[in-house]
UniProtKB/Swiss-Prot annotation:
Bias kind Basic and acidic residues: ranges: 444-455
Gene behind this protein: cnt6
Protein name: Probable ribosylation factor GTPase-activating protein cnt6
Signal peptide range in chain numbering: none
Keyword Metal-binding: yes
Residue span of region Disordered: 444-476
Keyword terms: Cytoplasm, GTPase activation, Metal-binding, Phosphoprotein, Zinc, Zinc-finger
Annotated source species: Schizosaccharomyces pombe (strain 972 / ATCC 24843) (Fission yeast)
Length: 923
């Protein structure tokens, strides 16, 4: 590609082992050339025998970061239906194979060597993209390889790749140790044959005082001769020093690696200390962990001191130890091999000149002077190399290294001393907190002893525990004149009878249980009682209570207040709490006799009957009296409108604040005649299912109708699963639990959690229905049976290359929501290559191919212009009415009556008119 058409401008490579960054510029021929290095050094190059190119050498520790700078022309690729990809291979043959054949988009992207480049929408002239290169897993140590990479443009129309810029490089791992601890044998670590123990014994014996002196330089194995003339002894000494130099180079690299690891540990420790402090503060504010005093008095200050101490240690470790040591290593230790090779070449050159000089028969003009000059030069070179090796093992270099470490440890000692002084300054606060904790432990010990005493009393007490016994009776005085009351409900245990009316206004009645009556005007909210009762399930009524299973009884929290009886289901879980109410106006309560269960009583209202079971006989009587008293007050305050519970009701005192105050009252849909009330309250009508649930003008179903509808829905679900096994599991997450929901416009069967996620996407994306609770049309049912989850997923998940991207049932809602948005909103997994929405949909409707119909609908066909064509293709055959339902659910609207009559038969027009869809609004 020409340079003017190049989309790539430059490439920056960072995270090299020396911390530098190398920049490359895109040339006109499509290759890259090095333009700069942050270290100021030349880039190492390696000759590739395969491609005959010089590759830049990148030394890394764990990974490399590539930053590509593109021009703004890359944003036009999407409009041209082109994709920008990065191809990376370790062999030239694999690299060339991508350009030697045509690959489909799915096959190209599924390759591990291809990375699709997603660029953000931006108006900037230059767009930056980051790619992280890392070696294969398990090959980090001693990993060296050639890498062939390029930026290419893939055309989805003709399935071809066009290369923009190619960049090849050679990577070398510096993370692992290149030498093993056993690389040098013991024979290589001792003196050479020419400097054996016999030579050492010629030295004068050391005095006892000299033996106790400590030296920072170890010279026991090397004797530096005063005469540095070339010879076997000199060469043996050099050979020994060269071996020790290689070992020194190895350990210097290892020391620098350990320093870097310690620095990383310091960074991680500092972050961990700060996060611990933040977490403790959050826990103190959000939970009952009262740590504010500890944080304010000691912990915050101590952790700040600790974090500052670690930060200073890390700073000195890098600036006072690593960088100076690395400079010495780079300047003197790393080029050891180069200096050795240079000396070998110089020695070889000199002795070659010596041979030529001695082979000459006679003295040529100037021959002696030239040789003598070479001899002098070689002597200086030999002396310089000797001094270099001496300094390396017994001179200034060793002194510099020891000085660096001594300076660092002196500074470390100063930091530790300062840290100790600062921690001593906050020690009194810690001691005071310890005293407060001892006092708290003493009070806690007293409380624990009281608990043990109470527990012992409960164990020793015979009979029922106090917590389960009914509360002591408390008298309640009605706060309104009872001589004005006339009871309309004979033969029931109401709170007032004919004898009660003749009594004086200071009449008192005794109600057992937790009942509260406040002074003031007569009002239903003067009666308040709450407690736990067992409620008999409505679907089990009409049978002998002794023969009913325990599952028919449910533990509800019951509250009597404001003239209503409130039932709290799932009262232990405030999140899932359900509340229902029963109006006590014209209600009565009485014991249920001749039943196998104890302590049962019934509540009868003009609308329903309800059966309850108390925990004792006294508790049952208390509830009956409380309900009767509340019913009596409610029945004779008809002129007053009861205050809604959501505005004035008290919460249940024993469960506060678990429940919401927004409750749904029980509606009375029609008036009841006197005979109707009498029939509802008669003993003969007790537990009659038809009397218990009465249908009214509002469309309330009979219980039998509800049961029949529920059974029919279950039959349809079983048929749906037998038709297609994939309908037994959720189409999105694969769950098999509560798979009783569906989306009628996609159409798929879902679990209850994924149905909520579909509902959050909006009805324009997914129209969610319940297979148990909602009424589905016949065509919607046929649609679900004939398509199913498998057919939909073959279209909507065709491009899902990695099955692990699909959520599992145990994943949280955020993961499932993100997948649903990609699948149904973005259509990220649908292959739209070469798809014409209108043509594909029409072909699918005519050939009755579900996959093409779903693909055409996902591609968003033009219903406004071609709606009549689609309608005509479906209405020709009445067996395709379920497909017509699918089109309606996805946006197809009916045309006007004139157009409809031209293409549709009269019978079909009558059918379509029942759909009542909106006509097109033409401008």
């Amino acid at each position: 590609m020409d340079g003017s058409d190049s989309l790539l401008k430059s490439v920056d490579v960072s995270k090299l082992d020396n911390g530098s960054t190398i920049s490359f510029r895109a040339r006109e021929d499509g290759f890259l050339e090095s333009i700069s290095s942050s270290s100021g050094k030349l880039v190492d190059m390696v000759l590739d025998s395969t491609s005959k190119e010089c590759l830049p050498k990148f030394s890394f520790q764990n990974k490399l970061d590539f930053y590509f700078l593109f021009s703004d022309r890359v944003l036009q690729l999407q409009k041209e239906r082109k994709v920008l990809v990065l191809i990376h291979c370790e062999s030239l043959q694999s690299f060339d194979s991508f350009f030697a054949q045509k690959l489909k988009y799915a096959d190209l992207i599924s390759s591990d060597n291809v990375h699709e480049i997603f660029l953000p929408d931006s108006n900037a002239a230059n767009i930056r993209y980051h790619w992280e290169w890392s070696p294969p897993s398990g090959k980090l140590l001693e990993y060296e390889c050639k890498n062939y990479s390029c930026i290419a443009v893939y055309s989805t129309e003709d399935c071809t790749l066009e290369r923009i810029s190619k960049f090849s490089y050679y990577t070398v791992s510096r993370c692992g140790d290149s030498m093993d601890d056993t690389f040098f044998s013991e024979s290589q670590r001792v003196t050479s044959p020419l400097t054996t123990s016999q030579t050492v014994q010629t030295q004068p014996p050391q005095s006892p005082e000299a033996k106790t002196e400590l030296s920072l330089i170890n010279t026991k194995t090397v004797i530096f001769p005063e005469n540095y003339e070339d010879g076997p002894s000199f060469r043996s000494m050099l050979h020994e020093l060269e071996q020790k130099s290689s070992l020194m180079k190895y350990y210097c690299k290892k020391i620098m690696k350990r320093i870097v690891q310690l620095s990383d540990a310091y960074d991680a420790s500092q972050v961990a200390v700060m996060k611990l402090s933040e977490t403790l503060s959050e826990a103190s504010n959000s939970t009952s962990m009262n740590m504010d005093i500890l944080l304010d008095s000691y912990l915050t200050k101590a952790m700040d001191i600790h974090a500052t101490f670690i930060q200073k240690l890390n700073y000195d470790l890098i600036n006072l130890l690593y960088e100076p040591f690395h400079n010495i290593y780079s300047s003197f230790i790393k080029p050891i091999d180069d200096r050795r090779l240079e000396f070998d070449e110089q020695s070889k050159s000199f002795y070659g000149s010596l041979s030529r000089y001695l082979s000459a028969k006679k003295d040529k003009k100037g021959g002696d002077s030239k040789f003598f000059q070479k001899e002098k030069t070689f002597a200086l070179q030999r002396y310089d190399y000797y001094c270099f090796m001496q300094d390396l093992h017994d001179g200034s270099i060793i002194n510099d290294i020891n000085g660096i470490f001594l300076q660092y440890f002196h500074r470390q000692y100063d930091h530790i001393a300062l840290f100790s002084n600062l921690m001593n300054s906050v020690l009194p606060n810690l001691q005071q907190l310890n005293l407060k904790l001892e006092k708290t432990k003493w009070s806690t010990t007293r409380r624990d002893k009281g608990r043990e005493m109470h527990r012992s009393q409960v164990i020793q007490t015979s009979g029922r525990p106090k917590s389960m016994a009914p509360p002591s009776p408390s008298p309640i005085s009605p706060s309104f004149p009872l001589h004005e009351i006339q009871s309309p409900m004979p033969n029931r245990r109401m709170a007032a009878s004919a004898d009660d009316i003749s009594q004086t206004s200071n009449f008192t009645t005794e109600i057992k249980g937790k009942c509260i009556s406040n002074g003031g005007s007569a009002s239903p909210d003067k009666i308040f009682k709450e407690g736990l009762l067992l409620v008999f399930g409505a679907t089990e009524l009409g049978t002998d209570l002794a023969m009913v299973s325990k599952a028919a009884w449910h533990k509800h929290w019951i509250v009597v207040e404001n003239g209503s009886l409130w039932e709290y289901a799932n009262w232990k879980d405030s999140v899932k709490s359900n509340v229902s109410s029963i109006s006590l106006k014209h209600a009565s309560a009485d014991k249920v006799r001749k039943q196998g269960r104890r302590f049962c009583f019934e509540v009868v209202t003009p609308k329903l009957k309800r059966l309850y079971q108390a925990t004792s006989a006294e508790e049952m009587d208390s509830w009956i009296e409380a309900i009767c008293e509340a019913a009596k007050i409610s029945s004779f305050q008809l002129s007053r409108v009861a205050t809604p519970l959501s505005a004035s009701v008290r919460r249940p005192s024993k469960v506060f604040p678990l429940f919401s105050t927004s409750f749904e009252t029980t509606p009375i849909s029609r008036k009841l005649s006197g005979s109707g009330i009498k029939k509802a309250f008669s003993r003969k009508g007790s537990w009659n299912l038809q009397q218990f649930f009465r249908s009214d003008n509002s469309g309330t179903m009979h219980m039998e109708q509800l049961e029949r509808y529920h059974a029919s829905a279950n039959i349809f679900i079983q048929m749906l699963r037998k038709t297609d096994v994939s309908n037994s599991v959720c189409a999105d997450c694969g769950s098999v639990k509560d798979v009783t929901w569906c989306s009628i416009n996609i159409p798929v069967v879902l679990c209850i959690e994924c149905s909520g996620i579909h509902r959050s996407l909006g009805t324009h994306i997914s129209k969610t229905r319940s297979l148990l609770l909602d009424s589905l049309s016949q065509q919607s049912k046929v649609l679900l049976c004939k398509i199913g989850n498998a057919a939909v997923n073959r279209v909507y998940e065709k491009g899902l290359s990695n099955p692990s991207l699909k959520p599992k049932p145990e994943h949280n809602a955020q993961v499932k929501l993100a997948f649903a948005q990609k699948k149904y909103v973005e259509h990220a997994f649908i292959d739209f290559a070469g798809v014409d929405a209108d043509a594909t949909l029409l072909e699918g409707l005519e050939q009755n191919k579900i996959s093409k119909i779903l693909l055409g609908l996902a591609a968003k066909p033009n219903f406004e212009e071609n709606g009549v064509v689609f309608l005509k293709a479906v209405t020709r055959d009445t067996s395709k009415l379920h497909l017509l339902e699918l089109l309606f659910m996805n946006g197809l609207l009916l045309p006007d009556s004139e157009q409809l009559s031209e293409h549709v038969s009269p019978d079909m027009q009558s059918y379509l008119s029942q759909k009542q869809f909106t006509k097109y609004l033409k401008e």
